Amino acid sequence: RDRMNKIRLVVASLLLGAATGFAQKPFNASGTGNPIIPGYFADPTVKKFGDTYYMYATTDGSGAGFGPAQVWTSKDFVNWTLMPMNWPDSHWIWAPDVMKHTDGNYYYFYCQPCMIHCGVSETPRGPWKNILGESEAVLVPDRFVTNAITLDGQTFVDDDGSVYLYWGTWGIYKGFGCGAGKLASDMKSFTETRLIPNTEATDFFEAPFVMKRKGIYYFMYSSGSCHDHTYRVQYATSDKPMGPYTYRGCILETNTDGTIHGPGHHSVLKEGNEYYMVYHRHDNPHSNRGFHRQLCVDRMEFAEDGSIKSLIPTHDGIGALASSVVKSKNLALGAKVRASSFYDAGFRPEYAVDDNNGTLWLSLIHI
C-alpha cells in the first residue's frame, strides 16, 4: 500500500508540474515563442484588421516608455515588421489603442501623463490627424471623471456598435478607481461617464481592458507595482459595460521561478473561438525597476460558468496563427559565435543567433 501511495504521489507531482509549466523551455532556450518581438516594449494592444495583425505598444527604448509612435504588423503572428507612424511627432507615447468604427474610419488613442489624445485615419497605421483639430488637443483631460487619474485609455465596442473608453492609473486610493465613458457617435465627446470604484475592481491600479463573451462583460486590469513581481492581471464581471462589476480574482501573475516577472498591462485577441492574452513582462535578466519590458502572449481558457481560468505564463507562446510568410531558412541559427567580450553570463555571444527575442549579446563596454 505504501508503495502504491508513493507511485500515486509521483504521478500527481508530474501532472502538477506539467500543468504549472514545470517542463517548459527555460527563458533563454533557443526558439522560444515569447517574447513575440525583439526589443523593449510594453502596454500592448493587438488587433486584426483584414488579414493582418497590428500590435501597438509603448516603446521603452532607453527605458520607461520614452519611444515614439510606431506599430508592428504581421501576417502570421510570428514574423513582424516595425513601421513608423506620423502622429504624434513626439516621444512618451504610452498605451496606444486602435479601433475600427462603424463609420469605416480607424481611431487611435494614446496617452501622455495625464491625458488621452485621439486621432483618426482611413487606415490602421495612419496617416493620423487629431480628431479635435489641433495636433495636441486633448480628448480626456486629467480627472475628467472624478477620482480617476487619466492614463491607459482602452476602447471596447459592444454588439450594437456603441464605443466605450476606459482609463485609469493609481486607482488604489480610497474612493478612486477607473474612469469609464460611452462615446458619442462623433467620437469627440461622451454621452455617459462613470467611476468604476476599486470596491468593485479590487486593488485596481491601472491598464483596464473590457471584453464581452456570451453575455458577460469582463473588466480586466493590472494590480500591484509595475516595477516589481507584484504586478499582475485581475478581473471582475458584469451584465453591463459600465458596471457595476463583481470582483472575480487574479488570472495572471509572476511564475514560480521568477523568469516571467511582473506580467501585466494586457489586451485580448480573439481569433475564431480562441482567446489570447497579450501582455508585457520584465526583461531577463531583470533590469532596475522594470523599465525594460518585453511582449508575450498566452492562450486564455474559460470554465463552464464563464469564469476565466488562471493563465499559466509560458516561454513557448502560441506560435503561428496563419501560414508563415517567411519561407527562407535562418542560416544564423545555431552558428558558432565569438566576441571580443561580453557583459556577463546573461548576455553571452551565442544569444545573438539563438532565435530568441528575449536574449541578446552585450559587450563588456556598451551604451
Name each model-derived stretch.
Residues 2-11:
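Bacterial N-terminal signal peptides that target proteins for export
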Residues 24-202, 212-258, 273-275, 280-325:
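Beta-rich carbohydrate-recognition and catalytic domains
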Residues 209:
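Aromatic-lined glycan-binding groove of carbohydrate-active enzymes
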Residues 264-267:
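Signature of short aromatic-glycine-proline-rich micro-motifs recurring in repeat-based ectodomains
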Residues 319-365:
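Disordered, acidic Ser/Thr/Pro-rich linker "stalks" and the adjacent N-terminal cap
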Residues 10-18:
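Bacterial N-terminal signal peptides
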